[in-house]
Amino acid sequence: MKKLLVAVVILFTTMASAQKNSILLGGNVGFSSEKIGESKLENFEFSPKVGYQFADQWTAGVEGSIMNVKTKGTDTAEKYKIGGFVRYTVPLSDVFSVFGDLGAGYQSTNVNDAKGMYASLTPALFINMKRGFGLNFSIGGINYDNLDGKNDPRQERFGFNFGKTLNIGISKNFGL
């Protein structure tokens, strides 16, 4: 069995060393393609994020996600998420910081009109480049989600994924 997985992920999140009373604008874009024999799967995701840094190390806001999954020979599946997040940042120096994002919310998909909840915890490293621009690196996290649809058994997933994925992003913080 031959498997090809191409992933392009751009992660735009807040500047981890941002100052109090600043706005976070960001998100990520991802694409993957997988082919096994005659079967082909394509996945596209866009996940925006908006928040407010209310204390030197704390940010809270709203996050969302739109995912489109196309499988050869079947209907296209669409999945939507909307929820909140909170971020705690620990500066290590003027250049490096680590942060953790905790998010939770509502999700739905057009497959069997399923609806449910999600939650995730993602640790990351921030590298401050210049004037509020920086790079973010995360290598996985912990996540849980459930979906319950018409004529379909309830789905529950728990993931513990460290070191299997790498997300690299650009970030910018806007002061008020």
Regions from the language model: what does each represent?
Residues F31-K49, E63, K150, R154-E156:
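Surface-exposed strand-loop-strand hairpins of Gram-negative outer-membrane beta-barrel proteins
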Residues F31, S47-L135, N167, K172-L176:
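Gram-negative (and chloroplast) outer-membrane scaffold detector with strong preference
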Residues G141-L176:
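Hydrophobic secondary-structure block in the mid-to-C-terminal portion of proteins
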Residues L24-N28:
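Short, hydrophobic/glycine-enriched beta-strand segments
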Residues M1-S22, G175-L176:
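Cleavable N-terminal export/targeting peptides
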Residues K20-S22, S39-N43, D75-K81, N112-Y118, ...:
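Transmembrane beta-barrel outer-membrane domains
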